[in-house]
Amino acid sequence: MDDNKFKLPASISRRRFVQGLAVGGVIASFPHVVRAGSSFKDNAATGSAPELSGKVIELTIAESLVNFTGVVRTATTINGSIPAPTLRLREGDEVTIKVTNTLSVPSSIHWHGIILPYQMDGVPGLSFKGIMPGETFVYKFNLQQSGTYWYHSHSGFQEMTGMYGALIIEPREQDIIVADREYVVQLSDWTDDDPMKVFSKLKVQGDIYNYNQPTVRDFFRDLSEKGLSSALSKRKMWQEMRMSPTDLGDLSSAALTYLFNGSTPLANWRGLFKKGEKVRLRFINGASNTFFDVRIPELQMTVVQSDGQNVHPVTVDEFRFGPGETYDVLVTPQSDAYTIFAQTIERTGYARGTLAVANNINAPVPAVDPVEWLAMADMMGNMSHDATMGVMDHSQHAPAMPMDLSQHAGPAAAFAKASTCLLY
């Protein structure tokens, strides 16, 4: 993509332009920057997404100019915002969602985790042909569930360029999760580079964006702490497998900027509360690549819902979730301000927002934790999807049928005796 494709008017300095956009990513103040006669929307917005509700909703897919890093780029947006509008619907309703594609290429919207007829699922080549340029596709389905979900494009790299939004379905009856107020927190990642170029680089060199490779300094640290034999063996097994102990993600902050409801860490999304209120946070991982470790320093979170399903409440200090997952948590803030801190699993960056009693109050932002090397259990222990899967609890299951697995390759070979499966 040509960095000089879009130039600023001579009367506006680059410094002023970047400063003016520091609190938001999508251009709203400079409609003359947008090319005339194109599908671009010149009235785009960012931060907490606008909210749409009702039984009939209209969405428009278009291109918008964005600036998250000081560089103007083209995004794929729904109704001109990143994230796309939050859709707040009700269980039991039949909804009609009219989606118009103004792009020059096909597009689609997939309703992630929603029970519906396959024709409405929004996956091109599988459930329908896609939404062709200039066409309007009408999604119509009954809402058979409630909870926190999301929607996104299933075409090309459009999700990666901004086409995602929250989908909140209120229960038919009174919600058993009671809160004084709530906020949607949609975490995502953004790249200024052409996603196809990013993908092409990964195909040539899978670790090209991994800037946490083991170093000589790491070796001497292990040598000092664990001795020569341990330091060498720790590296030998990875070398023999031609793998890296820091292969935690395909991409990193070398390619990505991390967004919190469409806002960069500098922009600092903000949600207000009153002390003692119970606040519901609907976390959605809308990233294309990134696993986030989420915590709110000095404030515990009680997980009450996972992927739209109510769960037995569990109080945690931190949780990890990957692309496509959702968690609803309850918090009861007592101080003036808290930072919602979502650091990436490979520890190269973070998204963050603030909960506060007023707009002029901030909380400290913690430093990113040191990267942790993977262990063999991380790489192999969870790859089997049978009864030997390391993360599954089979303690309440009947004993498995005795089978001799010793001649089979794979993790199951280590558990030739069925009784050992009950340990996992």
Where are these regions (language model features)?
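N-terminal secretory signal peptides
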Residues: 1-13, 23
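...captures the hydrophobic TM-helix bundle architecture rather than a specific catalytic motif
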Residues: 19, 23-29, 189
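Compositionally biased low-complexity segments at domain edges in trafficked proteins
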Residues: 181-209, 372-391
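Conserved small/polar residues in nucleotide/adenosyl-binding loops
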Residues: 424
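Histidine- and aromatic-rich segments of cupredoxin/plastocyanin-like copper-binding domains
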Residues: 120-123, 129-132, 232-421
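Histidine- and aromatic-enriched segments that form or immediately flank copper-ligand environments
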Residues: 52-178, 250, 255, 282, ...
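C-terminal segment of N-terminal export signals and the immediately downstream linker at the start
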Residues: 10, 31-67
